[in-house]
């Protein structure tokens, strides 16, 4: 027994879930291969790790270490690190600050000093008290270079030393201390050729005197301006004018020491220099201003002696680089993102092949579709990432083992949901699988490369604004990369990431960004799907709150009725009658007819300078339950546009239609629950059997249990797909005719109230066609059927009424006998003779029908239309027998008007009228 009530949300969800499980069972190895992709990729990492370990083993040979000298990469132990003198970072002589067009300060040296190499180095001062600034600046530099080789570092610390070379990555060695590089002693003034030899360990170098200038500026704004313009990027001339350091003494006095220090951070800027992070020579700047203040308070003999810089002793460095942590962000970004094209192409494939819309036409709501599809993709995604983490941990990758598994689970769970939501969002924009596949893989690999070569450098650059980092993380690919980068950093440090590290690592912000984007993307994707795919009003979520029940018929206004009268005189009598019948039914509020089309119109907008195209011109039509209405018409007449509006593929430009009392403009989702559709092209899953198709669509029609089994069996038998186990074979193995029969069976299962059949017997052999016609004829007992066809035989056999559609409008309507009687009031007389007897044939026809009209003439064969009112069939036979005695007649015939003749006549007449108009 078929359940007449529509399927509930959970019934629809159950139907789709069962269908998807069946479909995935047939693709089980595809899913297994997908889930095993992480294992394959982890094995590649393991192989690379083993090769790298073998290479590092040779490099790590401690026999190459001698004393405290380290190999490249710093693998040797250093039990006694060297003591290094502290120095200031000073610019090279051609980069030092001088007078320029964009620097108006008169106390700067002339730029000619750059040619002689005698430019001083400059330190700027500002603050609230000028006298204090003058006093402190006078105490900054020592007036001479004094050193005692027997007590080298303490005596060297009394001098202010500087280097033009940037500091190293650590203090085990200083690149500024080399035999070919001088060290500078900064003094208030220098005598000519002030150079001193200096021995630092095994390195023989020289100390050169360089003048140091301490200049006062009125406020910190001036200091900032001078520092900014001193960079080659900060002035229009592109000319460097570098300052050593700057001090803002602010409120410093004898009781308070409050100083801000400016220094050049570009020397350790990896993003700017393209080199590894380096130390900056800031400690000596702090020591200088501190000593100057102490001398101001206590006299010249008071100071804090800054003797040397020294690293802690270092053990041997094991050369066992963890490749997973090194390549992790880039590699695992690609691994996780590989799911995005899989999900996206799956969604777009259903859209491209119109599988989703055919499911919707048979009653599948948007809610169940979204829920089941989302749950499936989430399940696959979680199995995929669990496989990734599990296999990575099993083969010993520290990247996974050291980081807290619960943090990893939450991270991958949130991103998987975000990725699925984005796939739904992007799928609403595209309709071609090939296009979206190319775009998806470009995004996958582009995201990884940009993350590695751009975004990671920004993260590691301390001076890069945090706000810009957060802004870039709004792109989901970069938020994924940031999370994976933090995992790799914590894993390489040895401890791994714990929950208490979220605020320190930036993972907390990543979690928040991804969570918010997950929900926003899901909401926007659903909104776009409802507006652009389902055709709802942009404010449908507000309209639903205030709309009145749409099932109540609307009574036309007086203005609306008057506007219709303009067209009545232009229509044929039968079309006018149909219009009046529909208007009467609407005025009376009748809901007895299964289908009522009320002034239904569809206009396609003009393109490329062409005018708008009127596809359906104000159609009025009523179809009652138990009736099969056939639509005939030439190609381009508007039949497909009409069916598309009735099935929800297109929105009417104006007018409406009621199906079972429900307005297709407002209640299409409810209409779908009582509708069956056989589209012009078979929309089937190639790997599902005919039985599985019918089980799925039967469940959507709320058929359950034994009723479902019985309905499926009867459907298979009725369309001859039962015998020989045909119904249990994949639909991809069916012939075109078998697929057509299955599509018809799908449209009829569950006894829908309304069925649309678009050329249902296309591609069938005569026997199968007759059988299918009988199936449709039996099914229409309690169903309203609208059928489009080009077969006149099919139309006569199945249809209770016919309508001929030309240029978007009904030209006539009625049953086949009425149409033939109305438009075919003549016989067709055909005779074939030799060409020399053609005139005699014409005289014969004129003798039996003076008003006959020749309609065909070719090589001795002629056809004539004979008006029925002036022709007696017996006279025609006698005339032909008499003619046979005079000349040879090869063939002749007399036929009544066929439906095809009517169709051709009506179509030609209508098109001729339209052309004249």
UniProtKB/Swiss-Prot annotation:
It is found in: Membrane. Keywords: ATP-binding, Membrane, Nucleotide-binding, Transmembrane, Transmembrane helix, Transport. It is a multi-pass membrane protein. It comes from the Eukaryota. The keyword Glycosyltransferase does not apply. ATP binds at residues 633-640. Signal peptide: none annotated. The chain crosses the membrane at residues 34-54, 323-343, 377-397, 409-429, 435-455, 508-528. GO terms for cellular component: membrane. Residues 595-832 form the ABC transporter domain. GO terms for molecular function: ABC-type transporter activity; ATP binding; ATP hydrolysis activity. Its main location: membrane. Belongs to the ABC transporter superfamily. ABCA family. CPR flippase (TC 3.A.1.211) subfamily. This is ABC transporter A family member 12. It comes from Arabidopsis thaliana (Mouse-ear cress).
């Amino acid at each position: 027994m078929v359940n007449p009530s529509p399927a509930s949300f959970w019934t629809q969800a159950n139907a789709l879930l069962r269908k998807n499980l069946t479909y995935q069972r047939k693709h089980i190895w595809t899913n297994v291969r997908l889930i095993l992709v992480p294992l394959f990729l982890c094995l590649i990492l393991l192989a690379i790790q083993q090769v790298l370990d073998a290479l590092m083993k040779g490099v790590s040979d401690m026999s190459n270490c001698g004393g405290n000298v380290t190999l490249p990469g710093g693998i040797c132990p250093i039990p006694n690190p060297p003591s290094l003198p502290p120095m200031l970072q000073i610019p090279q002589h051609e980069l030092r600050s001088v007078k320029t067009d964009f620097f108006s300060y008169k106390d700067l040296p002339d730029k000619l000093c750059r040619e002689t190499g005698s430019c001083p180095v400059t330190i700027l001062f500002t603050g609230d008290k000028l006298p204090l600034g003058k006093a402190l600046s006078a105490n900054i530099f020592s007036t001479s270079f004094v050193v005692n080789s027997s007590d080298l570092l303490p005596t060297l610390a009394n001098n202010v030393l500087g280097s033009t070379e940037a500091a190293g990555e650590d203090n085990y060695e200083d690149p500024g201390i080399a035999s070919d590089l001088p060290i500078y002693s900064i003094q208030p003034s220098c005598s000519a050729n002030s150079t001193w030899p200096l021995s630092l360990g095994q390195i023989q170098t020289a100390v050169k005197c360089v003048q140091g200038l301490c200049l006062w500026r009125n406020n910190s704004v001036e200091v900032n301006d001078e520092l900014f313009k001193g960079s080659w990027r900060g002035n229009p001339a592109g000319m460097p004018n570098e300052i050593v350091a700057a001090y803002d003494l602010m409120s410093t006095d004898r009781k308070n020491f409050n100083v801000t220090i400016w220094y050049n951070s570009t020397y350790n800027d990896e993003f700017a220099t393209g080199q590894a992070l380096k130390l900056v020579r800031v400690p000596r700047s702090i020591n200088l201003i501190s000593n100057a203040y102490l001398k101001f308070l206590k006299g010249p003999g008071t100071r804090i002696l800054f003797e040397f810089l020294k690293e802690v002793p270092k053990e041997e460095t094991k050369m066992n680089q963890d490749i997973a942590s090194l390549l992790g962000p880039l590699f695992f970004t690609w691994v996780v993102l590989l799911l995005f094209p899989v999900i996206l192409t799956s969604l777009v494939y259903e859209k491209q092949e119109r599988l989703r819309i055919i499911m919707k036409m048979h009653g599948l709501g948007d809610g169940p579709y979204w829920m089941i599809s989302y749950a499936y993709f989430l399940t696959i995604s979680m199995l995929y990432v669990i496989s990734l983490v599990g296999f990575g941990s099993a083969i010993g990758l520290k990247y996974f083992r050291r980081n807290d598994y619960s943090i990893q689970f939450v991270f991958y769970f949130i991103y998987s949901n975000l990725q699925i939501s984005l796939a739904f969002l992007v799928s609403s924009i595209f309709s071609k699988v090939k296009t979206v596949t190319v775009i998806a893989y470009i995004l996958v690999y582009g995201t990884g490369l940009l993350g590695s070569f751009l975004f990671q450098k920004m993260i590691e650059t301390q001076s890069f604004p945090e706000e810009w980092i957060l802004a870039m993380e709004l792109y989901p690919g970069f938020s994924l990369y940031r999370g994976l980068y933090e995992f790799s950093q914590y894993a390489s440090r040895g401890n791994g990431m714990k929950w208490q590290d979220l605020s320190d690592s930036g993972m907390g912000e990543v979690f928040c960004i991804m969570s918010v984007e997950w929900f926003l993307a899901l909401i926007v994707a659903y909104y776009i799907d409802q507006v652009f795919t389902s055709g709802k009003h942009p404010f449908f979520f507000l309209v639903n709150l205030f709309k009145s029940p749409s099932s109540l018929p609307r009574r036309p206004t007086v203005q609306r009725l008057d506007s219709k009268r303009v067209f009545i005189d232009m229509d044929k009598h039968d079309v006018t009658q149909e219009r009046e019948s529909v208007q009467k039914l609407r005025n009376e509020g009748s809901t007895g007819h299964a289908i009522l089309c009320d002034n239904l119109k569809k206009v396609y907008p003009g393109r490329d300078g062409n005018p708008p195209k009127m596809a359906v011109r104000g159609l009025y039509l009523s179809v009652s339950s138990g009736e099969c209405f056939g639509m005939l018409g030439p190609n381009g007449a508007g039949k497909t546009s009409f069916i598309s509006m009735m099935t929800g593929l297109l929105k009417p430009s104006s007018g409406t239609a009621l199906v079972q009392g429900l307005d297709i403009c407002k209640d299409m989702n409810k209409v779908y629950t009582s509708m069956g559709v056989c589209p012009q092209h078979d929309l089937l899953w190639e790997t599902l059997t005919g039985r599985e198709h019918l089980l799925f669509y039967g469940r959507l029609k709320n058929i359950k249990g034994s009723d479902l089994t019985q309905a499926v069996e009867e459907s298979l038998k009725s369309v001859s797909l039962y015998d020989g186990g045909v119904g249990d074979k994949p639909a991809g193995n069916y012939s075109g005719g078998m697929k057509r029969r299955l599509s018809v069976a799908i449209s009829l299962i569950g006894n829908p109230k309304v069925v649309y059949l678009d050329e249902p017997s296309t591609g069938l052999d005569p026997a199968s066609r007759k059988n299918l016609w009988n199936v449709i004829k039996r099914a229409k007992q309690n169903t309203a059927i609208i059928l489009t066809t080009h077969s006149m035989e099919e139309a006569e056999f199945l249809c209770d009424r016919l309508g001929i559609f030309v240029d978007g409008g009904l030209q006539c309507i009625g049953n086949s006998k009425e149409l033939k009687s109305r438009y075919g009031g003549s016989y067709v007389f055909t005779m074939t003779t030799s060409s020399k007897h053609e005139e005699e044939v014409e005289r014969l026809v004129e003798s039996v029908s003076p008003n006959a009209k020749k309609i065909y003439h070719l090589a001795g064969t002629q056809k004539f239309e004979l008006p029925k009112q002036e022709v007696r069939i017996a006279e025609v036979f006698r005339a032909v027998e008499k003619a046979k005695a005079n000349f040879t007649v090869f063939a002749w015939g007399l036929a009544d008007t066929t439906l095809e003749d009517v169709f051709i006549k009506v179509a030609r007449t209508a098109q001729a009228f339209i052309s004249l108009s």
